[in-house]
A protein has these predicted regions:
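Secretory targeting and sorting signals
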Residues: 1-20
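Extracellular ligand-binding/catalytic regions of CAZymes and related secreted enzymes
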Residues: 23-39, 67, 210-212, 216-224, ...
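Helical hinge/lid and interdomain linker segments adjacent to catalytic or ligand-binding clefts
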Residues: 41-138
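Catalytic beta-strand/loop cores that center a nucleophilic Ser/Cys/Thr
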Residues: 72, 151, 155-232
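A glycine-rich, often tryptophan-bearing local segment used as a flexible ligand/cofactor-contacting loop or short
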Residues: 103, 108-179
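Beta-propeller domain segments
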Residues: 270-276, 318-338, 364-368, 373-375, ...
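Residue-level detector of Asp-centered blade-edge/turn motifs that repeat once per structural unit
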Residues: 304-307, 382-386, 450-453, 552-555, ...
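Asp-box/WD-like beta-propeller blade repeats and closely related beta-sheet repeat scaffolds
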Residues: 405-449
Length: 809
């Protein structure tokens, strides 16, 4: 090796802009396409812009890559040539021998313009490139080389070796598939002048909360390894490998081996899946005609049929130009139209399949005027293609009691006639019904979902006012209307004998009845506390307003999200701020509301005669329902910690706890376990778990990278979540928080002209994502209310199968 030293100095993007990028001269090089052969060869270039001895880090890197080439399975081996002579990049014959080029360089100009042009010709011919750590500091004045490596280190990057946690989000790329989900290792961690996420495919990120990133840090989304197809070839870069000891690590060597397998055409990989430009978001429905809901109602849920049609519902709010009736003396008070529309992707047309008269149209205003009831949820029977059965969760207007201000909620089965495109309203079979108070808004829930055993899950809200508790636990027993409490969620969500504030699980039968599957939270036959105090339909209790639920069709795991109360900050008197919540649910349980939130953070109890006075803290491990409005068990199941929770202050707020396990609830002492999200205005919208179908011929399906990732979102589109998260299977459903989160905000576009107010989202059988945008008002539809489709257009993995040098690895 020639004497030299890897430059510790460091030119960053801003400094580089002071000098214009030189125009490389035209080259007459003609490199065979693609370069290399089945006798795989890798070139390590370690040229230096400075004199002196070779860096020990570079020597360690060369030795590690040489060893990788001679070890492991025969099909993955390769030969290595290491050089610091840049003239190789102007020798078309020599350069064309190499399947991949590795840059183990320092900063500065390590290539002259002609040599850089040769490297560019090599990539255009289909070559592979692997840049390691300081390679991102090379060729600082070249825009083309910046694109090749993907990003430039910030001058403020820390120089000390620090131990940190790497989140390995890509579980399929050969460079990462064998690595731990959370990879803890020491290195010199680089900050980037411009975050490359969205322009490259990031396979791993470093978690800034686990080390000191210094000034110019990139935040929760801090890429550390990425790849992309670039200028005809394949480019992989890792910011790791900045220490000599890195190259002794088995897992880091595995990372390099996988990167070289892809860049040298031994293995395929998808390096396009998270590049924003590879997706297209298209509005499918048009604004309604004046005075009509010919395209869409007040958006409230969707489901896709096996043939690709999309069924979506309108809750019942009228077009804003239409009058509403709020006078309880009027028999038509709150009457609205719960509409079922169908979008056919083959004809690209919308039809109105049916309309139900629902209680749900009182417009906006305070909680004694507005209402969230109506047509709340839709699902299709697992054998829909054969029987045409559609299940609707709704509040029929015909069943309201205007005197007592009570209503009934139905889960009904209807038959859809595919030939006429109409729902047969006379075919209704009411499977399940239960009472709800309608004196005060809110929290109706609505989501429906099936598991693989034919069990139907039904999400119900706590049917409780948001007021009278200062935005903390909804546990004020005092307000009532004609004997029915409307501000005490212990009557509903915290009550083992009430179907509100729950996720129910039933098994619909052919005749329109239902049976109870084994394994619900209760059997309904419990004899505790005198008996008759449980409902066997309850699978999950303690949820506030679960508008959306989903079930992973591979694992049968239930996923849910629910909206929290209104307190803007935590209180040392009453407890946590408003937490919107997501939960991965693997077994029946109590998820806390209105006793505990987040990771078992308790509220303060209150009761008669003076609910304004705080009593003791709830015990999340042994909660008691001592409300005068409770007709269920006093002794409740222990609270299960949730997966994601967020407040206006940040994601996953947590506090120091005293000897009794009570958090301090002091704002200055809170830390955030989930720094990638934040609330404010917030309304959690659970999404699907994507499952990639390799047998599907759809060219627009989302890539396999997303397989197994859970989509979590919010009605609002600022700091609130719109992410795909990855859970550790070992802790999912047991209080484990996500190990990785990928922003979707540029794939599912935010903003007024995008999908600003996300209401529901589901993948169709073609692997494309359908999304409902609620619109810009409340309790109405408007010109922005729409059904959207998000499709993938990036193409398949690379290199193409016929360009692999050996049988696919």
């Amino acid at each position: 090796m020639a004497a030299g030293v890897v430059a510790a100095g460091v030119l960053s993007g801003p400094a580089a802009s002071a000098r214009p990028a030189p125009e490389p001269p035209l080259t007459t090089m003609s490199i065979k396409s693609p370069p290399g052969s089945a006798d795989v060869r890798v070139l390590i270039y370690h040229g230096s812009a400075a004199g002196g001895d070779e860096s020990p880090v570079v020597n360690a890197g060369i030795e590690a890559i040489e060893d990788l080439g001679q070890s492991g399975p025969t099909a993955g081996r390769f030969k290595v040539t290491a050089t610091d002579d840049a003239s190789v990049f102007t020798d078309e014959t020599e350069l064309g021998l190499y399947n991949a080029v590795v840059f183990l360089t320092g900063g500065g100009d390590v290539l002259d313009p002609e040599q850089e042009a040769g490297l560019e010709s090599y990539m255009e011919a289909g070559g592979g490139f692997l840049g390691i750590h300081d390679a991102a500091r090379a060729e600082p004045y070249s825009d083309w080389f910046t694109g090749l490596v993907g990003a430039r280190p910030a001058a403020s990057s820390p120089t000390a070796v620090q131990r940190a946690t790497v989140e390995v989000g890509d579980r399929q790329h050969p460079a990462t598939k064998d690595l731990p989900l959370q990879w803890k290792r020491p290195d010199k961690w680089l900050n980037w002048t411009k975050n490359p996420s969205g322009d490259v495919h990031t396979v791993a990120r470093v978690r800034e909360s686990t080390y000191t990133p210094g000034t110019g840090a990139n935040g929760a989304d801090h890429p550390v390894s990425w790849c992309r197809d670039y200028d005809g070839g394949r480019s992989f870069y890792t910011g790791m490998g900045g220490t000599e000891s890195s190259y002794d690590e088995t897992e880091f060597r595995s990372h390099l081996r996988g990167a070289l397998a892809w860049t040298s055409r031994i293995s395929q990989a998808d390096c396009k899946a998270t590049i924003n430009a590879n997706y297209k978001a298209e509005r499918l429905t048009q604004p309604n005609q004046p005075g009509q809901n010919d395209q869409i109602g007040e958006p409230h849920g969707l489901v896709t049929a096996p043939d690709g049609r999309v069924f979506y519902i309108g809750r019942g709010g009228a077009d804003s130009s239409q009058p509403v009736i709020t006078d309880w003396n009027n028999p038509d008070v709150g009457k609205g139209k719960g509409e079922i529309h169908v979008y056919d992707p083959k004809t690209k047309k919308v039809t109105l399949a049916g309309t139900l008269n629902v209680f749900g149209n009182k417009g906006g205003g305070d909680e004694l005027i507005k209402v969230e009831e109506g047509l709340l949820g839709i699902e299709l029977d697992p054998r829909f293609e054969d029987n045409g059965w559609v299940y609707l969760h709704y509040t029929p207007h015909s069943r309201i009691d205007r005197d007592k201000r009570m209503a009934e909620r139905y889960v009904s089965r209807f038959t859809y006639n595919s030939a006429t495109g109409r729902l047969d309203l006379n075919s209704e079979k009411v499977l399940l019904k239960w009472p709800v108070q309608i004196h005060s808004c809110c929290h109706a829930g609505g989501g429906l979902a099936w598991d693989s055993k034919g069990n139907l899950y039904i999400a119900t809200g706590d049917n409780n006012s948001s007021g009278f508790s200062d935005g903390y636990s909804g546990n004020n027993p005092q307000p009532n209307y004609k004997g029915v409490s409307f501000a005490d969620a212990r009557r509903t969500a915290g009550n083992t004998n009430n179907l509100n504030g729950k996720i129910l699980r039933i098994h619909p039968e052919q005749d329109g009845t239902y049976t109870l599957p084994e394994g619900n939270l209760f059997t309904g036959k419990e004899t505790a506390e005198g008996g008759g105090k449980t409902r066997g339909e309850i699978y999950v209790m303690g949820v506030r307003n679960p508008a959306r639920i989903s079930i992973d069709k591979k694992t049968d795991t239930l996923y849910a999200g629910w909206v929290g109360p209104d307190a803007g900050s935590p209180s040392t008197t009453w407890g946590p701020a408003k937490y919107d919540t997501f939960a991965a649910i693997t077994k029946p349980g109590n998820h806390g509301w209105p006793y505990c939130m987040g990771n078992k953070q308790p509220y303060r109890d209150r009761n008669l005669p003076d609910p304004s006075k705080p009593l003791g803290w709830y015990d999340c491990n042994a909660p008691k329902n001592e409300s005068p409005n409770n007709d269920g068990l006093v002794n409740l199941p222990p609270v299960t910690s949730n997966t994601i929770w967020y407040s206006p202050q940040g994601g996953g707020p947590d506090f120091p706890r005293d000897a009794n396990g009570i958090p301090s609830y002091k704002t200055a002492e809170q830390k955030f376990l989930l720094p990638w999200l934040k609330g404010g205005g917030q309304a959690a919208m659970d999404g699907p778990v994507y499952r990639y179908d390799a047998n599907s011929a759809s060219a627009a399906k989302w890539p396999s990278y997303w397989d197994g990732k859970w989509f979590v979102g919010d009605f609002y589109d600022a700091d609130q979540p719109r992410h795909a998260v990855l859970l550790d299977p070992k802790t999912a459903g047991q209080g484990g928080i996500p190990v990785h989160a990928e922003s979707l905000k540029k794939i599912i576009p935010i903003g007024n002209d995008g999908i600003k107010n996300l209401m529901d989202w589901k993948f169709g059988p073609d692997g494309t994502l359908y999304v409902l945008d609620y619109g810009r008002g409340f309790f109405t539809s408007d010109s922005k209310s729409a059904l959207w489709q998000v499709t993938y257009k990036g193409g398949g993995p690379t290199p193409a199968a016929d360009q692999l040098v050996r049988e696919a690895q």
